[in-house]
From Swiss-Prot:
GO molecular function, one term: AMP binding
Location(s) in or outside the cell: Cytoplasm
Primary role: Plays an important role in the de novo pathway and in the salvage pathway of purine nucleotide biosynthesis. Catalyzes the first committed step in the biosynthesis of AMP from IMP.
Name this protein carries in UniProt: Adenylosuccinate synthetase
Amino acid sequence: MVTIVLGAQFGDEGKGKITDLLSQSATLCCRAAGGHNAGHTIVHDNITYDFHILPSGLISPDCVNLIGSGTVVHVPSFFKELDALKAKGLKEADKRIFISDRAHVCFDLHSVVDGLEEADLAGKKVGTTGKGIGPCYSDKASRRGVRIGEVLEEGVAEDKLRSLEAGYRRRFGELQYDLEDEVKRFNEYRTKLQPYVVDQMAFLEKYRSCPSVLVEGANALMLDIDHGTYPYVTSSCTGLGGAIQGLTLNPTSIKSIVGVVKAYTTRVGSGPFPTEQINDIGEKLQSVGREFGVTTGRRRRCGWLDMVMCRYSNAINHYTTINLTKLDILDDFDEIKVAVAYKLDGRRLESFPAQLEVLDKVEVEYVTFPGWKSNTMGVTRWEDLPVNARRYVQFIEQEMGGVPIKWIGTGPARTHMIEREV
């Protein structure tokens, strides 16, 4: 049976920790979509691991890992990340990681084009990670991309890469890019990649009846190309639909869908953010929460928890349980606000609006809670949380339509987690 872990906000919710926890009992852990633009950190046995394209199930010694067909893979980053994990003690990691032959290749060329396209947008920049993800998915949609399996065929990837470069040169003029160097490296990767590349359909068939498959979502629902705050989104389907599509999942095999919700809201890059606090509150959340992007190092914008957004996310992803993260970051606040509705011209909106112009104008309606002003770092039992912290959690549960909050994160370590009976 399949468990899917999905971000409910703008990403950076802390999905890696619950994925790490669940992967301990998983036979197979999969990434379905996205690329090395994603990023999360896991602390295990006092060692900090940073993940981008690799599934975090690699930390579990008995878990096999797959990068699925809906992803885009920057091959140098794949090997660099794998080498970093091995250097930190995961010696057999390279024996437990595989890539779908249908995943697409993200070239250095795509990163160059990403920067040029952002520059063209001038004052309306999306705020991408600059990793080339958007141009890579564009090439995929335009049917001119290169699949991982094609790297293994002599001359195929090279011919397509040369064609891509010529097309971009016609569009942008001379590029700050060394085509021959990338061609040379991919000729070398042809042999190096061979042990990792699999036919996804045949590979997954072997695990069809296994009791525990874990799907690790990247980014989050509000960055989804269809359902997020378009155009300030990533270029892949980051919700439930993307997981099913990218891994050819049978929907009837899905046992649980875990929505990961940070106890406040953060966002990297540009785009609407109704509950953002551009004040001392936002600065405090940023500082105490150490809100810097794992992939880019950029400061994250911070604000109060937005239940309008979370309810919308739930309506699309159909969570069966919630993992609430970073509750301890709110320990020292006198009062804590939660957004429960948006108003436009004095009228409550029925749902999360699609139009950016509307989002920019909404008035946010908050419910204010008294803070608990005590240390919850490392708390592992529900009854040991302060009363006001428990009330905060229960209110979120109520606002999510009764979807139970099964896990509550109270610190960075794997052991800093409350697991409730729900």
